[in-house]
A protein has these predicted regions:
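Exported/periplasmic ABC-transporter solute-binding proteins
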Residues: 1-199
Length: 199
């Protein structure tokens, strides 16, 4: 909250971690069918920074890599850049940049050779794209919970000061098991199932 408010106002807020968002690299189905099912973190960094420009360089088809990314203001991009790319800047000048994760997914689906990233919540049905493992670890909630998969963050709710009884009851409901099972069906992780609470 401190990057959005001045420090004095931010100090009044109490942070409540309410769920987990896992981000997954996704590729056009033709790339996956040609054998790209997993990339090392170094390969992922090389692709998203524009150094690797053809899929054959990472065991895929002889096809140009098309980057589909989010803008610099995106929280999805910030999380992916920090944990999947080790903080390396994406080659935005060489990518199709979109403000919306749903549009990004459609662009990856419809563009030969495309790669991008979305939250698992966008992949609950038949999305028409394939996820890519990082260093052999699939982007799943189970692998996020165990701490094996590295690209995740918490979603937050904030209260001004400690929550009152009604707000506490709502937060308990949001973070409880019954609501948690619904969140998992929608691709969101349950905070209490995390074995790691920090990266």
């Amino acid at each position: 909250a401190e990057d959005k408010l001045d420090a004095d106002k931010a100090k009044e807020l109490v942070d409540h971690q309410v769920c987990v968002i896992t981000m997954a690299p996704i590729v056009n189905e033709d790339v996956a069918k040609a054998g790209v099912k997993s990339l090392t973190k170094d390969q992922l960094i090389s692709i998203f920074t524009g150094k690797t420009t053809n899929w054959k360089e990472v065991g895929g088809p002889d096809e140009d890599i098309v980057l589909v990314t989010r803008p610099g203001s995106s929280g999805t991009r910030a999380t992916f850049q920090k944990y999947a790319l080790d903080g390396n800047e994406e080659a935005s000048n060489a990518s199709m940049e979109t403000d919306d994760s749903g549009v990004l997914l459609t662009n990856v689906k419809d563009t030969k050779g495309a790669i991008g990233y979305v939250a698992l919540s966008y992949l609950t049905g038949d999305a028409g794209v394939e996820t890519v493992a990082i260093d052999g670890v699939e982007p799943t909630l189970e692998n996020t919970y165990s701490g094996e998969y590295p690209v995740w963050t918490f979603e937050h709710m904030y209260t001004k000061g400690e929550p009152n009884e009604v707000v506490s009851a709502f937060l308990d409901y949001i973070t409880g098991d019954k609501y948690g099972s619904q969140m998992e069906k929608l691709g969101y992780g349950v905070s209490s199932k995390m074995t790691k609470t920090e990266h």
